[in-house]
Regions:
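Conserved ATP-binding subdomain of kinase catalytic cores across diverse folds
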Residues: 1-37, 54-65, 69
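A short, local hydrophobic-aromatic micro-motif
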Residues: 12-15, 75, 110
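Conserved hydrophobic "DFG−1" position in protein kinase catalytic cores
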Residues: 32, 79-80
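AlphaC helix of the protein kinase catalytic domain
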Residues: 37-46
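Short alpha-helical scaffold element within the canonical Hanks-type protein kinase domain
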Residues: 48-52
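Hydrophobic residue at the +6 position relative to the catalytic HRD Asp in the kinase catalytic loop
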Residues: 72-79
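Active-site beta-strand-loop-beta-strand hairpin of nuclease catalytic cores
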Residues: 81-85
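C-lobe/activation-segment region of protein kinase-like
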Residues: 86-146
């Protein structure tokens, strides 16, 4: 959460972190991020191309900022009341000081498109809205960087 806050990406505020030694895991207690997930919005009939473009720019921004979120999907992306996109359920998020490499970007985008209804919303009716916004946010040729 700190890495996201440093990059001004809306996210839940961590209240406590608990280590569970026997399971070799951690649990997080946090204050929820206000808003609705994109999955909630699209299942309620949201069809705004501007939101698709905003999503493309948001994901590109995450990748350029060194944010690798293994659980990236529309159920973990929130549209906040002020119109910004943010992330929830961020326990498996990793942050580095440099843009994530191409192979991880591709894996992340594949995961984003895993749910059939999510994929249908992102790609329909104009499949280029998300792609165009993603690539423009990265700049000419940036998507092919290693």
């Amino acid at each position: 959460a700190l890495a996201l806050a440093e990059r001004e990406i809306p996210c839940p505020r961590v209240m406590a972190l608990y280590r569970i030694p026997c399971a070799k895991r951690e649990a997080v207690r946090y204050r929820p991020l206000p808003g609705k997930t994109l999955r909630e919005l699209i299942r309620a009939g949201e069809e705004a191309p501007a939101l698709r473009a905003q999503l493309g720019r948001f994901v590109a921004g995450l990748h350029e900022a060194g944010i690798y979120f293994r659980s990236l999907h529309l159920g973990n992306i929130v549209l906040t009341p002020d119109g910004a996109l943010g992330l929830i359920d961020i326990a498996d998020l990793r942050a580095s000081g440099k843009p994530i490499p191409r192979h991880r970007r591709l894996r992340n985008l594949k995961h984003l498109m895993r749910d059939e209804q999510d994929r249908a919303w992102i790609c329909h009716p104009d499949a280029t809205v998300f792609d165009r916004a993603y690539n423009i946010a990265l700049g000419q040729g940036a998507a092919d960087r290693a």
